[in-house]
Amino acid sequence: MKVNAKSDHKLLPKVTKVVAKGDAKGKKVNKAWLHDHINDPYVKQARKEGYRARAAFKLKEMDETLGLIKPGDCVVDLGSTPGAWSQYVRRKLSPTGAAVGALNGRIIGLDLLPMEPIEGVVFIQGDFREPEVLAKLEQALSTEKGPVKVDLVISDMAPNLSGIESADAARIAHLVELAVEFAQTRMKPDGALVVKLFHGSGYDDLVKLFQASFKVVKRMKPKASRPNSSETFLVGRGLKNVTPV
């Protein structure tokens, strides 16, 4: 479910001139951010490898560290737009690591906003809490032997941060709780959930939520996550309580 434009999720084209609105201080800040973004090694690498966003390398590091994605897996990407995480999963589930061709597994992306097609990825636009969206999800998970359970749920969902700590903490917590609830109803008992969150008010409570929901919990700060960002990730493996659909 796409809640906002993720700060680093759209690669910018080469820029020869920067025009920033606002006062002189704002212009300097915008120019500094744009300079850092354009020269970011992960942005350059994402462009080189054909990823839609540098965020692909965050999931890549977590996967390589923890072995999250395996051949034949069914993966659901919550808040999938613009598609970098789905792109990475698609390549990981390819027998040859390719962006096209054979696929050994199943990938479903869900988001409020539209997403450009990715070969092999089933995309469903809408709120995954709504009945009509859930019906499409059920169809995407169906097989001749019946519906399949999900091996991995990944969520890079993030709210627009207002700067008001209490309000931001509530929005972040809500998205994490939605992802946990989704995993509890759709995931295999030995599956895994990856969510993004931010250090600050409410962080410890979300860690406790994960610890109450999963047998193993890992805190991750991938190298591709900007050092000056409070962004971090939680990975939960093995459901403690399985909720029937």
From Swiss-Prot:
What PANTHER family does this protein's entry cite? Answer: RIBOSOMAL RNA METHYLTRANSFERASE (PTHR10920), RRNA METHYLTRANSFERASE 2, MITOCHONDRIAL (PTHR10920:SF18)
What this chain does, per the entry, is described as: Specifically methylates the uridine in position 2552 of 23S rRNA at the 2'-O position of the ribose in the fully assembled 50S ribosomal subunit.
- The domain of life is Bacteria
Protein name stated in the entry: Ribosomal RNA large subunit methyltransferase E
Q: Report the EC number(s), separated by commas if there are several.
A: 2.1.1.166
The family assignment reads: Belongs to the class I-like SAM-binding methyltransferase superfamily. RNA methyltransferase RlmE family.
InterPro entries given in the database record: RNA_methyltr_RlmE, RNA_MeTrfase_FtsJ_dom, rRNA-MeTfrase_E, SAM-dependent_MTases_sf
Q: Where is the active site?
A: 196
Write down the species.
Polaromonas naphthalenivorans (strain CJ2)
**Top-level EC class:** transferase
Example GO molecular function: rRNA (uridine-2'-O-)-methyltransferase activity
Reaction(s) catalysed (UniProt annotation): uridine(2552) in 23S rRNA + S-adenosyl-L-methionine = 2'-O-methyluridine(2552) in 23S rRNA + S-adenosyl-L-homocysteine + H(+)
Main subcellular location? cytoplasm
Which keywords does UniProt give here?
Answer: Cytoplasm, Methyltransferase, rRNA processing, S-adenosyl-L-methionine, Transferase
Localization terms from the record? Cytoplasm
A GO cellular-component term linked to this record: cytoplasm
Q: Which residues bind S-adenosyl-L-methionine?
A: 83, 85, 111, 127, 156
